[in-house]
Amino acid sequence: MMLGAEGGEGFVVKVRGLPWSCSADEVQRFFSDCKIQNGAQGIRFIYTREGRPSGEAFVELESEDEVKLALKKDRETMGHRYVEVFKSNNVEMDWVLKHTGPNSPDTANDGFVRLRGLPFGCSKEEIVQFFSGLEIVPNGITLPVDFQGRSTGEAFVQFASQEIAEKALKKHKERIGHRYIEIFKSSRAEVRTHYDPPRKLMAMQRPGPYDRPGAGRGYNSIGRGAGFERMRRGAYGGGYGGYDDYNGYNDGYGFGSDRFGRDLNYCFSGMSDHRYGDGGSTFQSTTGHCVHMRGLPYRATENDIYNFFSPLNPVRVHIEIGPDGRVTGEADVEFATHEDAVAAMSKDKANMQHRYVELFLNSTAGASGGAYEHRYVELFLNSTAGASGGAYGSQMMGGMGLSNQSSYGGPASQQLSGGYGGGYGGQSSMSGYDQVLQENSSDFQSNIA
C-alpha cells in the first residue's frame, strides 16, 4: 500500500541522463503534464562529491497518479539526450541526498559556473563582456592553464548570487568569437577539489622512492608521478580567498599566476581504485564510465581531447603526468553513461594531430571485466552497465564496497580495492548506491521510524 508523502514511501521518481547544465525549470517543463510537489523545490538534483551535477535527480510528485504519468516520460528526450525515469521513494531519496554531493548542502548554490570551449588566449575581460549585465564577484574569474602554461579552454566564474548564476547558464552554447561556449553548474567544492591540495603534500615536488616507472604493476602504491601530480594541485592561495584578479599576482603556495593573471596550477584529477597501465597511474571516476587513451601527441591539451570525442561530451579529462614531470601520452576520459563510453570507441585509430589513436575495448555488462591482450591497444574502456536502478560496476559484500577495478598491466596488476562509507565509497559509479540501498533498506526504514 502506498503511504502518504509525509512519511513512508511518498510519491517520488528518479531521473537519470539529464544534461549537465539542466536547471529546475527545464525539469519542470519536461514533466509539464505532472504536478510536482512544491514546484521547483520538489526537484532534488544529485551532485558528485566534487560538487558537479551527476545527471540525476529526484522529483517529488503530489500523488500516485502523478507518478504513473511521470513514468510515461521514460526514454523521452531533453535536448539531445534521452532521459530515464524510475519509480523511487523517500527512503532512497533521503539516503542518496545525504551520502552524495560535497560536504555542505549549500555548496551547489554558491553562484559558481564552469565554462568550456573558450578561444585560445581568451581574457577575463572577454568573459566579463560575455556575461554583460550579470554581476560577477570581485576576483571571481579564474582561467586555469595546463602544466605547460597553455590555456585549457576552461574557466570558473562566481556570480553574486545563485539566481544570477542560473541566468548565466542560459547563455549555454552562445559564442565568444568563433567558438560556442558550454556552461555547466559548478561549486566552491569543485574548485577546491581541483586546486587546493593538502599543505603537507606541497613539499613533494619530486617523485618519491615508490614513484618510479613500473611501480604500478601489482604494487600497492599511489603510482606514477603521485608526488608531482598532487603537488600540482596548487594553489588559489589556501583555497577560495586567493582567486587571482584581472592583473595577476602570486596566488600563494602554488606556482602563482603568469603575466596574464592566469593561475599556473591545474589539477587533472584525483585518486581512485582504477589503476591503468605500467606506471600504476590513478584516476577517480564519478560515473564509472571511463575511456583510457594512449598514444596521444605530447602537446595534446584537454580541449584537444574534448574535440577528439565530439559530438560526445565527456564529463572530465585527466592527462597523465610521469615521474619526470612530463606527459606520458596517456589520458583518462570520463563519460556520463555507458552508452557514451561505448560510442567513444568508434574513434579507434582516428587521428589526433599527426598521430592516430588505437583502440582496445574492455567493457563489461553486469560483471567485472577481464584484462585483454591486444597488440594494437592504445585506447581502453572501463565502463559497466547494469539494469535500470541497479548498481553500475560495484559489488557489495558485508556492507563493504569492492569496486570493479579493471587493470591493464596484466594479471599481476589486478587488485581488489575496498571502500567503506555506508557501502558508497568503494563504488565506481554514481548509480552504485542502488544496490547498497537494497541491502540496507531495512536499516534505513527502522532509522526513519
From Swiss-Prot:
The record's gene field reads Hnrnph1
Which controlled-vocabulary keywords does the entry list?
Answer: Acetylation, Isopeptide bond, Methylation, mRNA processing, mRNA splicing, Nucleus, Phosphoprotein, Repeat, Ribonucleoprotein, RNA-binding, Spliceosome, Ubl conjugation
- Domain of life of the organism encoding this protein: Eukaryota
**Where does the record place a coiled coil?**
none
Instruction: Extract the ranges annotated as region (2 X 19 AA perfect repeats).
Output: 354-392
> Localized where?
Nucleus, Nucleoplasm
> Which residue numbers mark the cross-link Glycyl lysine isopeptide (Lys-Gly) (interchain with G-Cter in SUMO2) in this sequence?
K35, K87, K98
Annotated GO CC locations: nucleoplasm; nucleus; spliceosomal complex
Q: Which residues carry this modification: Dimethylated arginine?
A: R233
Q: What is the name of the protein in this document?
A: Heterogeneous nuclear ribonucleoprotein H
| Chain positions found as Phosphotyrosine | Y246
The record ties this protein, via CDD domains, to: RRM1_hnRNPH_hnRNPH2_hnRNPF, RRM2_hnRNPH_hnRNPH2_hnRNPF, RRM3_hnRNPH_hnRNPH2_hnRNPF
Q: Which organism is it from?
A: Mus musculus
Query: Pfam families from the xrefs?
Result: RRM_1 (PF00076), zf-RNPHF (PF08080)
For the modification Omega-N-methylarginine, which residues carry it? R233
